[in-house]
Amino acid sequence: MVQAKLHLTTVHEGRQFVGESGSGHAVVMDDAHGDTGAKPIELALLALGGCTAFDVIGILRKMRQRVTGYDVELQAEQQTEPPTVFTRVTIRHKLRGCVQPEALKKAIQLSETKYCSVSAMIGKTAKIETTFEIIPEEEAPAPGEATRASR
């Protein structure tokens, strides 16, 4: 079993915390009344986006798909009564490059059902819907690859 160990330190009268990950990276968090950091619930949604994005891009690379840009947009609805858990999340994947739609569908599906632990957790309370858009680009050599004309 993998264990996670993190640390939070109060910074501003208990209204702001700096969290430190086990790898030593810091993130600033604020409560619902402040504006000096991300709210914890926002970080949960960002974690979902990051988790699925890393999965999808890694799977697409293994499939030899050429991705030149990738954005993930997330929207969520929450319960009105505490705990205000997510009840619905929409993830929109926007990729640029030479990517086959079926490869992207497969990568998203694998992330959702097999690899993304954040998706598995949030999916316990929320319906997660995904959409995608591919913005095609002319097939060009990857950085560092020589073209026939330059050989």
Where are these regions (language model features)?
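Extended beta-strand/beta-hairpin segments
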Residues: 1-46, 57-151
